[in-house]
Amino acid sequence: LYGVNLCFDANFPDHAFADKLVDRLVRLGYNTVRIHHYESANGAVKGAADGLALNAERMDRLDYLLAKFYEKGVYVTTDLFTCRPVAWRAIGIDRDGRVDQQVYKNLIPVHEGAYQNWATFAKNLLTHVNPYTGRAYKDEPGLPLISLINEGHLTWCWRRIRGEAPMKKAWTAWLAERRAADAGFAKGLDDPEKVSESSAVLIAFMADIERKLVARQRAYMKELGVKALLTNQNCGS
């Protein structure tokens, strides 16, 4: 596979420009395109108060573009969360404003409200039927690869997330589980705010919650009938 990223408004050309764009990328030899940052405030959820409902006009443009890629034999990949605007209260936390996107990603494995918000948008997108193909995204053979969360690993913003109540609760529960087998495990690190992002104990914690999250997400994707291969290892640099 040899591809390019399309970011933000590049995912929503008018139909005439979409025809030209697809033809040009094919002539250049590309056979894969990543639809990236498509769910920004001006993208697929434009105007949605809850940040979950799909915008009909933006989706029409995206649907047409994707249909043209499929028609030309170009595969598509995307992420189920990159930068979608999410309000704190939309995930059940009584706080004004929006959740920082990296903080939100790190809340998904440890906070039920954040997970359900992720799952609801994923369902809205993947069950959406592209009128230009007649197929739902989950059934699209031209969409064989899906990243569950873009760059969601904990070490990116551990210093910001470790003081949040859901993360502290998850940390305490994890320590209790580990200490049931080894009473001296992570001695002196009951408070996650004392744990550095480079510590071995954080890596162990991160690996455990990541495994549990991905198992849950995979089961959910199977429940929805998703055909694509899945990954949660798009971790940036």
Regions found by a protein language model. Name each.
Residues 2-237:
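Active-site mouth of glycoside hydrolases
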